[in-house]
Amino acid sequence: MTELISIKDSSKHVDQEVKMHVWLTDKRSSGKIIFLQLRDGTAFFQGVIRKNDVSEEVFEAAKSLRQEASFYITGTVHEDKRSHFGYEIQISDLEIVSNNEGYPIGNKEHGVDFLLDNRHLWLRSKRPFAIMQIRNTMFKATVDFFEKEGFIKFDAPIFMHSAPEGTTQLFHVEYFNNDAYLSQSGQLYGEAGAMAYGKIFTFGPTFRAEESKGRRHMTEFWMMEPEMAWMHQDESLDIQERYLAYMVKQVLENNEYELKILGRDPEKLRPTTEGNFTRLSYDDAIKMLQEAGRDIKWGDDFGAPDEGYISEQFDRPVFIVNYPTTIKPFYMKKNPDNPKEYLCADVIAPEGYGEIFGGSEREGNYEILKQQIEEAGLNLEDYQWYLDLRKFGGVPHSGFGMGFERTIAWICKLDHIREAIPFPRLINRMQP
């Protein structure tokens, strides 16, 4: 019996007869030969039908195929060194499952809005396919890395009673007779998990009501947030470096085909796998920008152009450490050597992509954290449970958060973050 295989496994079946279920992405004919561009969700490759090698019925069926028709094929796999994939199939038989007219996305240039309106279909095309395969590798690498490091997956709630960072960029939800908000971060609940289980990571959707149309912003995005008990900031930076190096290495090892589809130069990513990220102080980053003629002073936060400039000075991610307390959230621990700054760090991705990680050592002292909550103008009652984490068995602890789509955008070298998620939610878009 002929074996049913995926396109991705073609290399294991060279010169063998196999069966596949596929969709048609494009077709061209030169009289007695029909060339079919095929996909099956694992890869794209070419099928060839020669009139002299198949029945009249099969050849006519192939001629009738329309874009995104679905069908079974039987044929023999051969090497094809001209293609990105490296293999093709000589088709001897096919069985049509569905074959309808009117597929809206033709093999021509389409506008961004048109493709977003048809995102449910555009996902089938080569570019989003490659991005989502890389996204999947990054997800698997994340789980593998943290399990090996002794972390457990910990699930934080989506509904929040209050804002984790005291911001106003919140989506309000009516929660029966109470007010609730969609989560901007699972961090505070992650800290509770760390005090129970030592080392945890949360991974899920977060929401931010930012009225921004910038290429690095969405209203719904995914965050990966580890929290680690008994750990100081320097140790946290070591973990961040190892994690990012491991994740990029997994993409390079498992997604060579997808990187080729995207035209992404893997050599631009390779330095990251070596680690050795520079740890640049906020003070030195300000000096670097000032020397470049930028209008910025100590105490200012970095804008996207500032982060972009800094990132272009390095061939791999860089840590910017110890920001002023005035521009970071209340829960961070102050630097014992300089109480005007926090023990915190952002990871800036190279090639102008800016911040992808943010983290800090958390303030572990009950009285100091209570004071910082009050100084931030937050309702102390809302954070009493959070203070309890320090009151009962509080220890030094640290954590960080990774913007998943921002990291994907850098690794895939995307122009806009909306490409990094299957169905982007933007200020002007909630469908499909």
From Swiss-Prot:
The entry's keywords: Aminoacyl-tRNA synthetase, ATP-binding, Cytoplasm, Ligase, Nucleotide-binding, Protein biosynthesis
Cellular localisation: Cytoplasm
GO cellular component terms attached to this protein's record: cytoplasm
Record carries keyword Ligase: yes
Main location per the UniProt record: cytoplasm
GO terms, molecular function: asparagine-tRNA ligase activity; ATP binding; catalytic activity, acting on a protein; nucleic acid binding; transferase activity
Catalytic activity: tRNA(Asn) + L-asparagine + ATP = L-asparaginyl-tRNA(Asn) + AMP + diphosphate + H(+)
UniProt xrefs under Pfam families: tRNA-synt_2, tRNA_anti-codon
Enzymatic class: ligase
Xref: CDD domains: AsnRS_cyto_like_N (cd04323), AsxRS_core (cd00776)
EC number(s) per entry: 6.1.1.22
Alphabetical GO biological process terms: asparaginyl-tRNA aminoacylation
Residue ranges of the TM segments: none
SUPFAM superfamilies tied to this protein: Class II aaRS and biotin synthetases, Nucleic acid-binding proteins
Subunit structure: Homodimer.
Family named by the database record: Belongs to the class-II aminoacyl-tRNA synthetase family.
Protein name as annotated: Asparagine--tRNA ligase
Species this chain originates from: Lactobacillus johnsonii (strain CNCM I-12250 / La1 / NCC 533)
Organism placement in taxonomy: Bacteria, Bacillati, Bacillota, Bacilli, Lactobacillales
